[in-house]
Amino acid sequence: MSWWVYILRCGDGTLYTGTAADVERRLAAHRRGRGAKYTRGRGPLAVVYREECPDQGAALRREAAIKKYRRAEKKALITDYAERRSRMKKAAFIGTGNMGAPLIQAACRAVGAEQVVVANRTRAKAEALAAELGCAVAEDNRAAAAQAGYVFLCVKPQMMEGVLSELVPALGDGQAVVSIAAGLTCETLRGWLAGAQGRPALLRVMPNTPAAIGRGMLALCAEAGTAEEYLAGVEDLLAPAGRVERIAEGQMDAFSAVAGCGPAFVYPFIEALADGGVKVGLPRGQAMTYAAQMVLGAAAMVLESGKHPGQLKDEVCSPGGSTIAGVAALEERGFRSAAIQAVEAAFRRNQELGKV
């Protein structure tokens, strides 16, 4: 497993060098004050350099070497890293629909709207979004791809082959193609890229709709052998959309079934809770707010406490109380089984979509 050497820039300008198997998770620990004592109280913190090493031992040796650098040498290292990354920053988005638009918004926040170009089958839709965000609209898909380092394909799976055949003449070495289509593997996508001038990097991202408000859960995977700069570049571009996590491609369909489809499973639950509130006497608007805020808070408890959801449930259920009575009613009606079956059904459909 790869390890990383990273440099954090603290709010007061201090540069902190460290190692981690997962830089984003380590950064989160620093931000919570659970990282090194040298970064506590010195926020905001930003990763300004990262370097991949083959193992932990190599990372520790590289960390020791960097720590011996003078500040000017560290700054030169950071500057070189930033310059290499900036050469790959311009992003094109093919498709401006419900899933494409949140990613476009994220990229505009990450690198500036001037570094983003969009194209859409219905040009008026692309123009409306561009007017809102300040990004450019390309004449067509190929023109968008030709001017970008990252080309995001935000189209439905059944449209992907046709879109790629149109883009192939504009794609080549030094570019990264990023698909958000469910079910379509890197192997399938690579086959449709035959004829490109060179070999663009190939990655997949699976977002969800909360990305529109910066609360998304996104998965990222890539074809074997993809350079780290492309993976890190996509992470940087999409970071404003929410949490971006690297996973194995074999887990993408399962991830999509849980996190991609999951919001549509939760919304009816919130609506049903609100309906229950109305039934027992709450005004509709208040019931909806209470239900939604409760789900938001419960999710935060799971993420921030580190406790198992079952433990958190037990902490609310007192013997003979109203909460355990409600939990029992859910169990009697197959609530848990229905949720599992929903994920399984979505997973099977994702696999069907990949059979092209």
Model-predicted segments: where are they?
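Internal alpha-helical scaffold of NAD(P)-dependent oxidoreductase catalytic cores
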Residues: 188-201, 217-254, 266-304, 349
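NAD(P)-dependent Rossmann-like dehydrogenase/reductase catalytic/cofactor-binding core
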Residues: 292-356
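N-terminal beta1-alpha1 ligand-phosphate binding loop
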Residues: 2-15, 91-107, 111, 120-122, ...
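GIY-YIG nuclease catalytic motif and its immediate N-terminal context
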Residues: 1-72, 77-82
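NAD(P)+-binding Rossmann beta1-loop-alpha1 motif at the extreme N-terminus of oxidoreductases
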Residues: 88-139, 143-146, 278-280
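Rossmann-like NAD(P)(H) cofactor-binding subdomain of soluble oxidoreductases
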Residues: 103, 123, 133, 141-220
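Small-residue helix-packing motif on alpha-helices
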Residues: 59, 74, 116, 126, ...
